[in-house]
Amino acid sequence: MVGSSNETKDPLTVVPRAQGFHFYKAIGGCIGVTCCSLEELADALQKVCSEAVIFHFERGDFQNWIRDIIGDNELAQRIDDVKMCSRQLSGEACRKELVERINVRILQLEVAKGPSVFG
């Protein structure tokens, strides 16, 4: 599908729960964790069981959600790059790499967005 719909999305947005990333350990094995933003995904990746991380990582679910729902093709590609070298990484090293890449991307997006007003 060639589309420009991702270009109009703000990757820092919070999506509705129905579009959130739902963690599973296996098909039909929902663990009750849903993420509705990149920040929530990075946080959840540090806490969920390694079986859930591996399940989704091997299927390409993280990249697909980031690309199709969040609208961040660049981060999805960075996750694809981790997948390509994953045979050399342990499960925990892979988890750490995913979290690091997501957090770096969040910072890049926040800087690009400019200063915000907190109040």
Task: For every predicted segment, state its role.
Residues 1-119:
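Terminal, compositionally biased segments used for targeting/anchoring and flexible tails
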